[in-house]
Each structure stands twice: as structure tokens, then as C-alpha cells.
């Protein structure tokens, strides 16, 4: 009998600062490696395959299940975990996957694979509003000249 365990590994983009290289994957692993030696600084059990964001000493990431996780970059300690899918009906949550996010001064802007743009209050970590942009996957948001842009299919959506 031959047993095969096929598993598609999806990793986040790498991000780095002067001391560490950070990445996560969909196998419940989030890593910090030394930028100088390549040695493991710390590891956490966080299930995310989207690009994390590093601001000063804080790492922001969103799990595949829809939890915003804030981590201390030096120690790897989890500072806060909040459910950002809390305003979405429970029976629909498992069908929604985060695509990407950006961190603004007051909000985190999270896009999903079913066309939602979720605004998350940065101080509380809770979703403050949800906008339906499309019925299908939309891109990770980006900001240019104080405007938010999202790509969907063959078009670019500009939000003020």
C-alpha cells in the first residue's frame, strides 16, 4: 500500500528589516530568520500565506481563517489576535479567504477572494465596515496620492 500526502505549500512574500527575514505559510508556520546568519530567531503557529507588514517593531498579518494577528518582531510574542470576519455570517466565513492588506494610519484595508474590502480599525483590531467591491477575487489594495486602488479582472478601481 502506497500512501501519498499531497499538500500544496503556499508561502507569503518575504519581508525584511536590518535584523530579520520574515515569512509565513499555509501550514500554520510563521518564521523569523536572522538576516545575517540565516538562523531561526523564532517561530509561531500562524496560518497565513499573504504578505505580512512590518511597522517599527510590530508585525501585522491576517490568517487564512480571518484573524488579524499582531506580533512583536524581536521576541515573536503574539500581542493581539482579533477576528476581522466577525461581521460576516458564520456559515459564509469558511468560504472567504484573505487576498492581501495594507496598513494605513487609522485603518487596515483587507481584500478577499470574494470581492470584499474590509476596513479594520487599527487601534481595536475590529472590522469597522465591509464594502462589496465585486463578486470575485480582487487584488491586494495599494495607496497612491491618498487614494486606494484595487485591481479586478481588467479594471482598476479607485476609492477616495
Model-derived features: positions:
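Structural recognition of beta-strand segments within beta-rich domains
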Residues: 23-25, 31-34
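Loop/turn-rich, solvent-exposed surfaces of beta-rich toroidal or solenoidal domains
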Residues: 54-55, 61-71, 77, 81-120
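Short loop/turn segments that connect beta-strands within beta-propeller blades
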Residues: 34-37, 73-76, 121-125, 160
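WD40 beta-propeller blade core
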Residues: 31-32, 69, 118, 157-158
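Extracytoplasmic beta-rich repeat domains
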Residues: 1-18, 39-56, 80-102, 128-145
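Surface-exposed loop/turn positions within WD40 beta-propeller blades
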Residues: 27, 65, 114, 153-154
Amino acid at each position: 500500500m502506497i500512501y501519498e500526502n499531497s499538500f500544496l505549500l503556499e508561502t507569503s512574500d518575504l519581508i525584511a528589516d536590518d535584523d530579520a527575514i520574515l515569512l509565513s505559510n499555509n501550514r500554520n508556520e510563521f518564521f523569523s530568520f536572522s538576516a545575517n546568519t540565516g538562523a531561526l530567531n523564532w517561530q509561531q503557529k500562524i496560518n497565513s500565506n499573504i504578505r505580512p507588514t512590518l511597522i517599527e517593531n510590530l508585525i501585522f498579518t491576517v490568517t487564512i481563517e480571518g484573524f488579524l494577528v499582531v506580533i512583536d518582531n524581536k521576541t515573536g510574542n503574539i500581542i493581539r489576535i482579533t477576528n476581522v470576519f466577525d461581521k460576516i455570517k458564520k456559515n459564509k466565513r469558511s468560504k472567504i479567504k484573505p487576498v492581501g492588506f495594507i496598513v494605513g494610519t487609522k485603518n487596515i484595508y483587507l481584500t478577499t477572494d470574494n470581492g470584499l474590502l474590509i476596513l479594520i480599525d487599527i487601534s481595536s483590531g475590529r472590522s469597522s465596515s465591509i464594502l462589496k467591491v465585486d463578486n470575485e477575487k480582487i487584488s491586494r489594495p495599494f495607496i497612491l496620492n491618498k487614494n486606494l486602488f484595487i485591481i479586478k479582472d481588467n479594471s482598476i478601481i479607485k476609492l477616495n
